[in-house]
């Protein structure tokens, strides 16, 4: 069904709602405030919509005052659009309020209602305000973002197209303790590239696994591909160990790492080698010419948690990679030949002087399935569906419009064709893996890579194997690799 509301064309199918708007930036736009408000509307019930037009969202603050937001579009998928500024309505009248004021009023209300600690609420509000500022900084820096609508994007371009972040989070762009200079160098929002930080490490201080090569061979291959100028540092007892450059500097400030340096077990070789780009998660990096992507522990609070890996998580990747060698996996693959998983079939970390594996030093090696086709239209779903930072069409709508033009069909027909292909190419293999095999791939939009040809979905790549789990009926399958008691069975 397609209907017009003012300048908005809404195309609805059974699965996806596409909203096409004129790409005109207006003073009413605030995508960061929209994320905050949508998370509030989703998680609380103390609000209402007016029955009169134009529709208003009303959030009561007390008997004598309320916040009023003009609703541009109220979405069945909860991706609501609001016009700003909001208005504070009191018994004596109303006046516009900025985001700092409205967010403070809402936080104060929730603190009073739920009897929350004042210090926690203050920290929360500070993070909300920082995230709001970070979003605008990225939008201001990426003034060419609108040009991304004009063409099919490759993997790297789509990974760095995400400026808004989680659509249902009050502070989706938190990045403590990054300062602005660090944010611009290390976050995908600013489209940077940077080399890795390398260390020469005594092999006794390295823990890890690798499936098809032993760990020494895997790390050597990675170094040879990505920093060949450092190979003269290699020996049987000294291996090359890569780190995210920020994390490398962070580790050198930790006492356990300083002890290793003092004993000559670790030597800092500095930044070297090929440039890498941060993907949507920030801690996972991509180099088009490397056979591996790499996912690091990063001691930074991104959105709502410090992003350090655990041994349990990297072992989940190994578990899934071993399952991929079994007959049942080959059967699943034969049923869905365009469904693939970026296996995380290797990991490594540093040991302290006592032999403990230090989680803040961990990284997982992720198979780069795009090394032979880096320009293919393989796009992370969250970048396609995010609210456009300039208030115009999303990247998904842009793809549907290109599809419409190419096939000579209406936008509504193109939208139905896209969603139908998405259901067959993406949803069906994910649901079948769980229903028939007991394999759960926790496929939020950041982990779904939609492979497209001419803007139409033709395949699925799943990534982030730490988000894999199993249903009880997968026990027999897990037993074939000796993992019947795996910790991620539920």
What annotation goes with each model-predicted range?
Residues 14-425, 452-490:
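Nucleotide/phosphate-binding site architecture used for ATP/NTP-dependent chemistry
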Residues 427-431:
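Short C-lobe core helix of eukaryotic-like protein kinase catalytic domains
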Residues 432, 436:
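Protein kinase catalytic-loop region centered on the HRD/HxD motif
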Residues 438-451:
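A short glycine-rich, hydrophobically flanked beta-strand micro-motif that places a catalytic Asp/Glu
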């Amino acid at each position: 069904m397609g209907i017009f509301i003012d300048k908005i064309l809404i195309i609805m199918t059974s699965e996806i709602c596409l909203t096409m708007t004129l790409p005109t930036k207006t003073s009413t736009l605030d995508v960061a405030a929209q994320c905050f408000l949508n998370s509030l509307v989703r998680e609380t019930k103390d609000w209402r919509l007016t029955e009169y037009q134009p529709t208003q969202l009303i959030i009561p603050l007390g008997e004598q005052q309320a916040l009023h937001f003009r609703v541009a579009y109220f979405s069945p998928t909860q991706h609501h659009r609001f016009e700003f500024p909001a208005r504070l309505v009191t018994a004596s009248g109303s006046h516009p309020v900025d985001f700092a004021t409205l967010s403070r009023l809402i936080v104060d209300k929730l603190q009073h209602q739920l009897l929350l600690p004042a210090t926690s609420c203050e920290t929360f509000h500070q993070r909300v305000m920082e995230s709001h500022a970070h979003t605008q900084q990225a939008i201001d820096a990426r003034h060419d973002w609108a040009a991304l609508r004009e063409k099919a994007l490759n993997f790297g371009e789509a990974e760095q197209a995400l400026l808004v972040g989680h659509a249902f989070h009050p502070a989706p762009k938190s990045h403590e303790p990054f300062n602005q200079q660090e944010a611009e160098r290390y976050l995908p929002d600013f489209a940077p590239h940077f080399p890795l930080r390398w260390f020469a490490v005594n092999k006794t201080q390295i823990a890890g696994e690798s499936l098809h090569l032993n760990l020494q061979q895997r790390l050597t291959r990675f170094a040879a591909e990505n920093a060949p100028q450092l190979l003269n540092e290699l020996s049987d007892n000294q291996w090359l160990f890569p780190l995210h450059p920020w994390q490398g500097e962070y580790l050198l400030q930790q006492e356990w790492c300083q002890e290793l340096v003092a004993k000559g077990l670790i030597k800092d070789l500095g930044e070297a080698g090929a440039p890498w780009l941060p993907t949507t998660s920030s801690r996972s990096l991509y180099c088009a010419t490397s056979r591996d992507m790499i996912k690091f522990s990063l001691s930074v609070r991104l959105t709502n948690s410090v992003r350090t890996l655990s041994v349990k998580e990297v072992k989940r990747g190994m578990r899934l990679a071993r399952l991929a060698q079994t007959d049942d996996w080959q059967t699943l693959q034969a049923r869905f030949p365009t469904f693939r998983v970026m296996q995380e079939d290797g990991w490594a970390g540093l040991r302290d002087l006592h032999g403990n594996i230090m989680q803040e030093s961990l990284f997982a090696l992720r198979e780069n399935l795009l090394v032979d086709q880096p320009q293919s239209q393989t796009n992370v779903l969250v970048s396609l569906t995010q609210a456009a930072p300039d208030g115009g069409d999303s990247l998904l709508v842009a793809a549907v419009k290109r599809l419409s033009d190419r096939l000579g069909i209406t936008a509504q027909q193109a939208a139905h064709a896209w969603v139908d292909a998405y259901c067959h190419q993406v949803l069906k293999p994910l649901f079948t893996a769980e229903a028939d095999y007991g394999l759960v791939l926790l496929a939020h939009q950041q982990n779904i890579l939609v492979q497209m040809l001419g803007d139409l979905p033709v395949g699925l790549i799943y990534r982030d194997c730490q988000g894999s789990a199993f249903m009880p009926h997968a026990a027999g399958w897990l037993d074939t690799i000796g993992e019947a008691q795996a910790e991620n069975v539920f």
